[in-house]
């Protein structure tokens, strides 16, 4: 799993992006978030274009409450944005001795094998499980071969990236 310092580093690196999105009114800095309880185990959150951290934190806390009451908690969040590292939220559930599965969509950034156009998002996927020891199992990954941050750093520093992981046409 990611350490607290790598999570903080991720936020720091993306700070300009968040500020730009607030100034362009993509992120609502004063959202009116609505939680609709579908059943005792399921809720739907309309995050009103809040910054993703706020929505994801509310989502995992709501799912944890449901799971503690009924044995399962499912929450869908819409109208939200980038929320950082999925493993951070999975860890919250794991600390409560709960299994967790977190996934999200992302805009097209990945081309299928042999294609010249992006079709799939990076679509992060995260699984967390208590292990019976102090160290939980957290798998925080995506369907891409390399994350965009590494590509951006390589471009900024005029370095190459591994062959076959990005389109250059």
Q: Model-predicted segments: where are they?
A:
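Phosphate/diphosphate-binding glycine-rich loops and adjacent basic-rich segments that engage nucleotide
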Residues: 109-169
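Generic secondary-structure boundary/loop-capping signal
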Residues: 15, 19, 24, 30-32, ...
């Amino acid at each position: 799993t990611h350490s607290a310092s790598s999570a903080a580093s991720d936020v720091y690196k993306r700070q300009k992006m968040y500020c730009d999105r607030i100034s362009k009114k993509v992120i609502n800095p004063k959202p009116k978030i609505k939680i609709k309880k579908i059943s005792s185990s399921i809720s739907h959150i309309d995050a009103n274009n809040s910054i993703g951290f706020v929505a994801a934190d509310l989502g995992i806390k709501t799912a944890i409450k449901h799971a503690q009451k009924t044995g399962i908690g499912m929450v869908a969040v819409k109208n939200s944005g980038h929320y950082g590292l999925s493993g951070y939220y999975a860890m919250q559930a794991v600390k409560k001795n709960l299994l967790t599965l977190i996934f999200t969509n992302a805009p097209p950034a990945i081309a299928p094998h042999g294609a010249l156009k992006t079709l799939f998002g990076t679509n992060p996927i995260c699984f967390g499980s208590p292990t019976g020891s102090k160290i939980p199992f957290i798998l925080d990954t995506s369907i891409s071969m390399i994350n965009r941050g590494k590509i951006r750093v390589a471009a900024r520093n005029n370095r190459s990236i591994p062959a076959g992981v990005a389109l250059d046409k």
